[in-house]
């Protein structure tokens, strides 16, 4: 089974920049997307259905913000939207699809780079996410976590390495 994760930074823009052609070339069984930045009624279903993919989207309440998706060639047995924590679920950050005893997650972690408040939100999120995954693994041990973790441990992890030590978390 081939699984790919991809932060598209806007799904509609990614489609116009060649995502469907790339998808044909790579041919994953499952594609986990982050930062879809669209509402369900904006999803270009015909593009992906023509390639044999079913889509499961979880959008943020705020339009044009965040959002995750799982595109799959095989219909999942179950899809879980969110972690059951309203503050996070309102931002469309977590979706899980179960295929038999295998679970695949697409997650978009908060970045925390826009200021102290969002950095604090991110730190609480990371703690809650860890607790959630620990509990989930008790019933779904075959768990694949895909996503954008918004963690820049090394210069290679950021698009502009000069920014690595200017955002809140690396400075602390």
Describe each PLM feature range:
Residues 158-163:
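Surface-exposed, charge/polar-rich loops and edge strands
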Residues 119-140:
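A long, amphipathic alpha-helix that forms part
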């Amino acid at each position: 089974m081939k699984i790919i994760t991809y932060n598209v930074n806007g799904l509609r823009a990614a489609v116009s920049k060649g995502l469907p052609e790339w998808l044909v070339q790579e041919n994953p069984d499952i594609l986990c997307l982050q930062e879809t930045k669209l509402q369900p009624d904006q999803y270009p279903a015909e593009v992906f259905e023509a390639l044999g993919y079913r889509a499961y989207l979880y959008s943020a309440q705020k339009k044009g913000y965040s959002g995750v998706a799982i595109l799959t060639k095989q219909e999942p047995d179950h899809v879980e939207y969110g972690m059951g924590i309203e503050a996070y679920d309102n931002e469309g950050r977590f979706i899980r699809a179960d295929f038999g005893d295998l679970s695949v997650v697409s997650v978009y972690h908060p970045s925390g780079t826009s200021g102290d408040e969002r950095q604090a939100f991110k730190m609480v999120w990371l703690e809650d996410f860890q607790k959630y995954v620990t509990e989930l693994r008790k019933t779904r041990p075959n768990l694949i976590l895909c996503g954008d973790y918004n963690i820049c441990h090394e210069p290679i992890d950021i698009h502009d390495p000069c920014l690595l030590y200017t955002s809140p978390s690396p400075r602390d």
